[in-house]
């Protein structure tokens, strides 16, 4: 429902590699949603045609709402400013692979998250994943007004990690 070439092509490729067929929607403008159908009802109909649904939507909480009406698994490909767990999994895999090249792991690393941390759904999901590791120091670098939401900071803090909030990058 939210356009993204990379998300659409990567999920399509993954489904094809798993031996499944891909059925794509053409966006919200030409869907029953544009005529007032609820996400729940749309999910009920789409799940009758699919083995699984990968969904990307511009509204927060939309993927969870869709999943309540769906009878098949729903994969969150991004829901508004909330989450993007599949991208976070890919980012985590990339971080692990790069650190493994140097025979290091994620535990005890110093990780900087930089940019729009308030609306950056990928960093929300990645921060939650990183909570499962040990002794990480997070530097959260964002301008005032775009700092990480408090519920993410609370999750990181409750996992026992150190947090440094910074409003700009400083050169040496």
Where are these predicted regions, by residue range?
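Glycine-rich phosphate/diphosphate-binding loop of Rossmann-like nucleotide-binding domains
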Residues: 1-13, 97-172
């Amino acid at each position: 429902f939210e356009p993204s070439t990379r998300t659409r092509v990567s999920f399509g490729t993954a489904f094809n590699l798993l031996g499944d067929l891909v059925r794509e929607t053409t966006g919200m403008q030409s869907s029953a949603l544009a005529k007032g159908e609820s996400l729940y009802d749309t999910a009920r109909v789409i799940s009758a045609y699919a083995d699984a649904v990968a969904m990307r939507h511009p509204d927060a909480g939309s993927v969870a709402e869709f999943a309540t009406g769906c009878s098949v698994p729903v994969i969150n490909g991004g829901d508004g400013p909330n989450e993007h767990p599949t991208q976070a999994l890919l980012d985590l895999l990339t971080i692990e692979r790069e650190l493994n090249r140097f025979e290091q792991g994620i535990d005890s690393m110093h990780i900087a998250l930089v940019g729009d941390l308030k609306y950056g759904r990928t960093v929300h999901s990645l921060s939650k994943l990183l909570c499962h590791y040990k002794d990480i120091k997070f530097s959260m670098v964002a301008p005032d007004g775009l700092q990480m939401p408090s519920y993410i900071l609370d999750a990181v803090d409750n996992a026992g990690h150190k947090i440094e909030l910074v409003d700009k990058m400083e050169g040496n």
